[in-house]
A protein has these predicted regions:
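Polybasic, glycine- and aromatic-enriched phosphate-binding surface used to engage nucleic acids
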Residues: 1-229, 250
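Amphipathic alpha-helical coiled-coil/heptad-repeat segments
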Residues: 191, 226-267
C-alpha cells in the first residue's frame, strides 16, 4: 500500500509510542467454535426445558453451570452490547466432561441428532476431530478467561466496536476476546487512532467492511503510561468520548492536520 505523506507521518507517530498489544501481558483469543451452532447455542425456552428435565437438584446445578450467556458479533456495539437472550452449552473438550453425568443434556443432544453432532467428517456430520460427539469442535482450553471480565468485539465491522463484557459472558467465533479488564486499553481500541492503524494492516472489503482479526489488533502499538485513561467509565458519555479522543490524539502526538485527517477519513 502506498501511503500519502500525512499517512506516513501518522503511522510513524503511532509506531513510535509504546509496544504492540500482543507483547503486553495479555492473551487474545477467538470466541467459541462449536461446529454446530444450531445445537450448542440455545434460547431461554430451550435452556429452561433442559433444566426442567433434570432428575435431581445436583444434576440441575451441574447442567446450569455449563449453560452460559453468549454474545454474537451482531450483538456487540461500541461500548455496549445487546444480549439476545442466547446461551451456549459449554461442553468444551478441555473440561473432560462425562456426558452420563448430564442425562437431560445428553437426551437433548440425542434428540437433535447423533449423526449430525459426531465429529467424524462424514457427510452431514461435523468436521473430523478427536473430540467426542457431545463436545464443541474446539477444545477451548482458555475457557476460564470467559469467566473473567474481558474486552470483546465483532470480527467484521464498518468500524471497530469494542466493549467490556463481564465475567461469565461468552462470545462465539469468530468474535475475538482480550482477557483483560483494563479500561485504558478498551478506550485506546475505540479511538480513531487505533481504528486507522488496524485498518491499515489489512484490506477493506466491499461496502467498507473490515475484518478485525486478532493478528491485526495485536499489532497496535499501545502507550505504556495510559493508566489515567482508566478514570473514564466503561461506557463513557458523548462528552467523555470526545475528551478521550483528544487525549489519545495527544498521546500519539498527532498534529491538528493529522487529527482532522482521521476525523474526516472515509473508507
Amino acid at each position: 500500500m502506498i501511503l500519502s505523506p500525512i499517512e506516513q507521518s501518522i503511522k510513524r507517530k503511532i509506531e513510535a509510542v509504546g509496544k504492540p498489544l500482543k507483547d503486553w501481558d495479555i492473551q487474545i483469543y477467538r470466541g467459541v467454535l462449536t461446529g454446530c451452532n444450531e445445537a450448542f447455542i440455545i434460547d431461554e425456552a430451550k435452556r429452561a426445558e433442559i433444566l426442567s428435565n433434570c432428575q435431581s437438584d445436583d444434576e440441575r446445578e451441574r447442567t446450569e453451570a455449563i449453560i452460559r450467556p453468549i454474545l454474537r458479533g451482531r450483538d456487540i456495539r461500541r461500548y455496549g452490547y445487546d444480549w439476545a437472550g442466547l446461551y451456549i452449552i459449554g461442553t468444551f473438550p478441555a473440561l473432560k466432561l462425562d456426558i452420563e453425568s448430564y442425562p437431560s443434556l445428553k437426551q437433548y443432544f440425542l434428540d437433535f441428532g447423533y449423526d449430525r453432532l459426531k465429529q467424524t467428517g462424514d457427510k452431514g456430520a461435523r468436521k473430523k476431530t478427536s473430540n467426542q460427539w457431545f463436545e464443541t469442535q474446539d477444545s477451548i482450553s482458555y475457557w476460564e478467561d470467559f469467566e473473567k471480565p474481558k474486552i470483546v468485539w465483532g470480527n467484521l465491522n464498518l468500524k471497530g466496536a469494542y466493549t467490556h463484557a463481564p465475567a461469565g459472558i461468552y462470545v462465539n467465533a469468530p468474535c475475538p476476546i482480550i482477557a483483560t479488564e483494563n479500561l485504558a486499553i478498551l478506550h485506546i481500541l475505540n479511538s480513531n487512532v487505533a481504528d486507522y492503524y488496524i485498518r491499515s494492516l489489512g484490506v477493506t472489503r466491499s461496502g467498507g467492511y473490515f475484518e478485525y482479526k486478532p493478528m491485526f489488533v495485536g499489532k497496535l502499538p499501545i502507550p505504556l503510561s495510559i493508566d489515567y485513561l482508566q478514570a473514564f467509565p466503561e461506557t463513557p458519555s458523548e462528552d467523555q468520548e470526545r475528551m478521550l479522543q483528544i487525549m489519545i490524539y495527544d498521546i500519539y502526538n498527532l498534529s491538528v492536520e493529522e487529527r482532522l485527517y482521521l476525523e474526516t477519513l472515509k473508507y
